[in-house]
């Protein structure tokens, strides 16, 4: 009997999903493209840096080594651009970080999706002889 009572009370206090985000009308913003050797992440923010939407190659169903391809970066950027345009975005300033293969593909697909790219800036961090890099691969 006690188990049934516990089950019923748990169902009554079941938490609701978080409320759906309201659409913000942001005509200008920033697109941050982080392209690593393993993945590409596209984050679209307002001018203050608050995240409006994001997408990545892994989020779009690519697994393993396919995440690091230019096509995966293109799909991720298209997805992020579509979400941003639903929030009223028209112009973006692009900031590219990292050495990955999807850098140019992501920028091209942002433009092809209908966003006007006003500037492209490379913000890849360059160490002043910081951490030791990974050893060279011997194949």
From Swiss-Prot:
Domain of life: Bacteria
Example GO biological process: translation
Pfam family, any one: Ribosomal_S11
Cellular component, GO annotation: ribonucleoprotein complex; ribosome
Keywords: Ribonucleoprotein, Ribosomal protein, RNA-binding, rRNA-binding
Basic residues compositional bias, start-end: 14-23
The keyword Ribosomal protein belongs to this UniProt entry's keyword annotation: yes
An example molecular function term from Gene Ontology annotations: rRNA binding
Feature: compositional bias, Low complexity: 1-13
Region (Disordered): 1-30
Subunit structure: Part of the 30S ribosomal subunit. Interacts with proteins S7 and S18. Binds to IF-3.
NCBIfam families: PRK05309.1, uS11_bact
Family: Belongs to the universal ribosomal protein uS11 family.
Role this protein plays: Located on the platform of the 30S subunit, it bridges several disparate RNA helices of the 16S rRNA. Forms part of the Shine-Dalgarno cleft in the 70S ribosome.
Protein name as catalogued: Small ribosomal subunit protein uS11
Source organism phylogeny: Bacteria, Bacillati, Chloroflexota, Chloroflexia, Chloroflexales
């Amino acid at each position: 009997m006690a188990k049934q009572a516990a089950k019923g009370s748990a169902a009554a206090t079941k938490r609701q999903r978080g409320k759906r985000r309201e659409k913000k009308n942001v005509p200008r913003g920033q697109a941050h493209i982080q392209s690593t050797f393993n993945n590409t992440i596209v984050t679209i923010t307002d001018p203050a840096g608050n995240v409006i939407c994001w997408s990545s190659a892994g989020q779009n169903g690519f697994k393993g080594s396919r995440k690091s391809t230019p096509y995966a970066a293109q799909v991720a950027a298209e997805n992020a651009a579509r979400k941003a345009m639903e929030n009223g975005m028209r112009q973006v300033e692009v900031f590219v970080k990292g050495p990955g293969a999807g850098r140019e593909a992501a920028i091209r697909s942002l433009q092809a999706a209908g966003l006007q790219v006003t500037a492209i800036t490379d913000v890849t961090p360059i160490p002043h002889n910081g951490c030791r890099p990974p050893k060279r691969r011997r194949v």
